[in-house]
């Protein structure tokens, strides 16, 4: 390990010696500002208006060190060294504006049609409630008199109220930029729907002929009837010609004659070609 060795002639001068004592003495003379870093505190600048020292430094005007700008917290004003003093306080919260009599009268009068209509409604309510109060007061004395004095006709508003309401309605109708009868919106896909309907629609019927074919149709019907008649007569003649040999044959071979059926079948004449009469033929 490294060992510290004392230097002859400097013992007690570096740490805790005469040098340390000199440093403490100098700091005590300069004050607490020197202990914090050696920067002296700025001198308090007096306000040129109120001579108050409650001021602070703001900045240098145009970065010029000869024109510092300060602010006075007492009179709330700025000033620049070498400049002109202006009597303009900072912030307008301290000043109070005075209201004129015309503005107060305008504020008290109804300025909008809605306020006029509200006043008219209040007047009508007051006029409607006055007969009720009178009838209620008389009801304390006699119930029958109260029932007899019940108002039968509603209170009618005054002419001034009607004029105010008409004026409000006219102003609202004239100043309304949006019409009340708005047409319904058109469908967005109207063209596409029409195109799809035209694609899937059935084909149109064929056009009607220019000339009429009523007489030609009748002629065709007559020709068809003639052809059918010829076809029906021709097969009948051929059939008769073909059946001529069969008609010329003797009909007795297909008939039993006068012999009863039982005697004919039991006589054995029809079984002469059978060699063994004991054989049963189905």
From Swiss-Prot:
UniProt keyword annotation of Metal-binding present: yes
GO annotations of cellular component type: nucleus
InterPro entries: Dof, Znf_Dof
Chief location bin: nucleus
Residue positions binding Zn(2+): 47, 50, 72, 75
GO molecular function, one term: DNA binding
Region span, Disordered: 89-161
Biased composition (Low complexity): 102-117, 125-161
Keyword hit for DNA-binding: yes
Compartment(s): Nucleus
Residues in Dof-type zinc fingers: 45-99
Source organism superkingdom: Eukaryota
Induction of synthesis: Induced by gibberellin.
Keywords recorded for this protein, A-Z: DNA-binding, Metal-binding, Nucleus, Transcription, Transcription regulation, Zinc, Zinc-finger
Annotated TM spans: none
Main function: Transcription factor that may transactivate seed storage protein genes in developing seeds.
Protein name as annotated: Dof zinc finger protein 4
Gene label: DOF4
């Amino acid at each position: 390990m490294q060992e510290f060795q004392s230097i002859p002639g400097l013992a007690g001068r570096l740490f805790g010696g005469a040098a340390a004592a000199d440093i403490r003495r100098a700091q005590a003379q300069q004050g607490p500002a020197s202990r914090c870093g050696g920067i002296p505190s700025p001198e308090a600048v007096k306000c040129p208006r109120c001579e108050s020292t409650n001021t602070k430094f703001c900045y240098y005007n145009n970065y010029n060190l000869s024109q510092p700008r300060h602010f006075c917290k007492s009179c709330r004003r700025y000033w620049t060294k070498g400049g002109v003093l202006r009597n303009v306080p900072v912030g307008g919260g301290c000043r109070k504006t005075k209201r004129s009599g015309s503005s107060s009268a305008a504020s008290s009068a109804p300025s909008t049609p809605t306020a006029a209509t509200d006043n008219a409604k209040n007047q009508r309510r007051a006029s409607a409630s006055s007969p009720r109060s009178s009838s209620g007061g008389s009801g304390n004395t006699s119930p029958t008199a109260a029932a007899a004095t019940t108002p039968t006709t509603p209170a009618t508003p005054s002419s001034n109220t009607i004029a105010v309401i008409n004026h409000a309605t006219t102003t609202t109708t004239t100043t309304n930029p949006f019409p009340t009868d708005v047409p319904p919106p058109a469908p967005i896909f109207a063209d596409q729907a029409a195109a799809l309907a035209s694609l899937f629609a059935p084909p149109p019927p064929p056009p009607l002929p220019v000339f009429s074919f009523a007489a030609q149709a009748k002629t065709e019907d007559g020709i068809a009837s003639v052809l059918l008649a010829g076809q029906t007569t021709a097969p009948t003649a051929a059939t008769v010609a073909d059946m001529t040999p069969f008609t010329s044959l003797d009909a007795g071979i297909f008939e039993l004659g006068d012999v009863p059926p039982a005697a004919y079948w039991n006589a054995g004449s029809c079984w002469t070609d059978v060699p063994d009469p004991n054989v049963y033929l189905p």
